[in-house]
Each structure stands twice: as C-alpha cells, then as structure tokens.
C-alpha cells in the first residue's frame, strides 16, 4: 500500500471530500487508512466508572477508517499527487516518489 502512517493526505471522494488530515493508522490487509478528523462517526458505548470514580461512555465521536482509493498523498509542495517507487542506488531499498514532481516523499 502506497499510503503510510504519518502521511498528510487529501480526501478526494466521499462525504469529507476536500479535507486534509494526517494518517493515524494504516490497515494494508484491508486497504484502509484512519485519517485524523475525517469520517467521524458516533459510537454508542456502555457507561463505565474508572478507579477514580469518573464516568466515561455514552455517545462517543471517533474517526473510522476510509478506503485508500479515496485519499491522495500531499507532497512537499502541498498539492495532491500519485505515488511511485524508485530504487535507491546506495542502499538498494525502494523509495516513494511523487509522480507530479519526481521528488522523494518523506513520511
């Protein structure tokens, strides 16, 4: 999967189209990413009491994962781009590059 944890992404489709956020978690086996502030859902949780007596629970708002095809990585220029790979000559490892300008993508 070409989107990694820590990347800044732009949502290109869906109810949050146009929103930018940081990838909090990537789920490559499901092709989904969890983006900060995007796809917020309300989850009903049981009210529980912790050791200090504070209550938590009720209706909690949290982010839900979205499909990786609905986001684009934002490059160093602040514009959305597609991602490609090149092999680094010194280390022999794959490096992600921006298809828009050819620069390396730093996570």
From Swiss-Prot:
Functional description taken from the UniProt entry: One of two assembly initiator proteins, it binds directly to the 5'-end of the 23S rRNA, where it nucleates assembly of the 50S subunit.
Protein name: Large ribosomal subunit protein uL24
NCBIfam families: rplX_bact
Keyword terms, alphabetized: Ribonucleoprotein, Ribosomal protein, RNA-binding, rRNA-binding
GO molecular function: rRNA binding; structural constituent of ribosome
Biological process, per Gene Ontology: translation
Keyword Ribosomal protein: yes
Subunit and partners: Part of the 50S ribosomal subunit.
Pfam families recorded: KOW (PF00467), ribosomal_L24 (PF17136)
Family: Belongs to the universal ribosomal protein uL24 family.
GO cellular component: ribonucleoprotein complex; ribosome
RNA-binding found in the keyword field: yes
Source organism: Mycobacterium marinum (strain ATCC BAA-535 / M)
């Amino acid at each position: 999967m070409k989107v990694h944890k820590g990347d800044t992404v732009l949502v290109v489709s869906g109810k949050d189209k146009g929103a930018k956020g940081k990838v909090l978690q990537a789920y490559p086996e499901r092709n989904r990413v969890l983006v900060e502030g995007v796809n917020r859902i309300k989850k009903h949780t049981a009210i529980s009491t912790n050791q200090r007596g504070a209550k938590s629970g009720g209706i909690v708002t949290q982010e839900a994962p979205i499909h990786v095809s609905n986001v684009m990585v934002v490059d160093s220029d602040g514009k959305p781009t597609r991602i490609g790979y090149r092999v680094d000559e010194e280390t022999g490892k794959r490096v992600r590059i921006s298809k828009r300008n050819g620069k390396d993508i730093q996570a």
